[in-house]
């Protein structure tokens, strides 16, 4: 499989739940060091039963927004990002994510920060967001492997239910009014 490539037919075997992993890192995208968070997320998502594409390793900022928009257009159920959520001048992932979200889900990043803060007080500095764009759930995770593990621990009991809810799950979708009536 190529970086960010897809294996045909894999998502059908996973109940149709498809996920994309995007790593936001100026240095990893330039080859300065290896992305460790993205593969960890991909492994975790596979363990949850998702067919996973990526990680796509891109510089922070506009390339992250482009990857999110492409993932939404491709119909992924979930897009998890890692990196770019801190407070350094180059951390722009929350800002570009906010531009694509239609509905915010503040409880998810709050839970991730609270979970991480129990072990590492600086987890409170993460500015990650979560929300829905189209029919895609997007969640920003920190760039550290510890932050990724914390995020996956919080997401594991939530993701499949969230995807089912976004799809209409146990709640009927609104019926459009018949213009003839």
Locations of the language-model features?
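Non-catalytic beta/alpha edge segments that cap or flank active sites
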Residues: 1-181
């Amino acid at each position: 499989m190529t970086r960010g490539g897809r294996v045909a037919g894999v998502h059908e075997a996973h109940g149709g739940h498809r996920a994309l992993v995007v790593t936001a890192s100026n240095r990893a995208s330039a080859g300065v060091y290896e992305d460790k968070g993205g593969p960890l997320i991909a492994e975790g998502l596979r363990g949850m039963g998702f067919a996973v594409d990526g990680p796509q390793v891109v510089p922070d900022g506009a390339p992250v927004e482009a990857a999110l928009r492409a993932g939404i257009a491709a119909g992924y159920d979930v897009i998890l990002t890692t990196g770019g959520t801190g407070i350094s001048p180059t951390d722009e992932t929350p800002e570009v994510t906010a531009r694509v979200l239609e509905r915010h889900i503040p409880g998810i990043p709050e839970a991730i920060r609270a979970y991480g803060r129990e072990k590492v007080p600086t987890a409170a500095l993460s500015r990650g967001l979560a929300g829905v764009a189209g029919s895609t759930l997007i969640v920003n995770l920190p760039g550290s492997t510890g932050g990724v593990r914390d995020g996956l621990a919080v997401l594991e009991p939530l993701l499949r239910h969230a995807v089912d809810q976004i799809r209409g799950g146990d709640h009927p979708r609104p019926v459009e009014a018949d213009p003839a009536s």
